[in-house]
């Protein structure tokens, strides 16, 4: 059997599988992020509602099974992405980069000027990946109840 990877736009019917993929991918961060990641509260219903309201997602399927996904939404003239999730068994294959490439291609098709994301201050490996792909820090912010930065906002210009 050949190993086939397909990246495609998600539909609301994908919501349960997206929620499960996010939960499995983010499990490594449980108890390590302060405050806890909102990804742990994602539900199929919430994701379906987001998709129905105009947010989007790109899913990666290998041989028909979802192995990764990323949520997207237009914000302030840019395309924002979050919940970049790759299943543990699919890590180290370049899939995160492929998903980000797909986000960037979508933003270009939409005629948007850039891509934005947020990453936790403590996730230095993730920051390193984003920087290697041309993303630059634009600001830091604290989650509610914190008096120090917990998140870094990054942006990549497409113009």
Language-model-derived ranges and their functions:
Residues 86, 92-105, 132:
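Conserved acetyl-CoA-binding loop-helix of GNAT-fold acetyltransferases
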Residues 116-120, 131, 136-153:
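Conserved catalytic-core motifs of GNAT/GCN5-like acyltransferases
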Residues 59, 65-73, 80-85:
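Conserved beta-strand in the GNAT
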Residues 20-48:
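Conserved GNAT-fold acetyl-CoA-binding loop/helix
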């Amino acid at each position: 059997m050949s190993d086939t990877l397909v990246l495609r736009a998600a539909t609301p019917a994908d919501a349960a599988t997206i929620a499960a993929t996010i939960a499995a991918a983010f499990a490594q961060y449980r108890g390590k992020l302060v405050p806890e990641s909102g990804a742990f509260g994602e539900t199929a219903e919430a994701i379906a509602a987001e998709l129905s309201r105009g947010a989007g997602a790109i899913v990666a399927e290998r041989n028909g099974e979802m192995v990764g996904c990323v949520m997207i939404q237009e914000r302030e003239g840019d395309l924002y992405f979050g919940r970049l999730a790759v299943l543990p068994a699919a890590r180290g294959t370049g899939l995160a980069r492929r998903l980000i490439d797909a986000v960037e291609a979508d933003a270009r098709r939409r005629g948007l000027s850039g891509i934005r994301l947020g990453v936790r201050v403590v996730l230095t490996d993730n920051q390193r990946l984003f920087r290697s792909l041309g993303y630059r820090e634009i600001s830091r912010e604290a989650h509610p109840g914190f008096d120090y930065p917990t998140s870094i906002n990054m942006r990549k210009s497409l113009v």
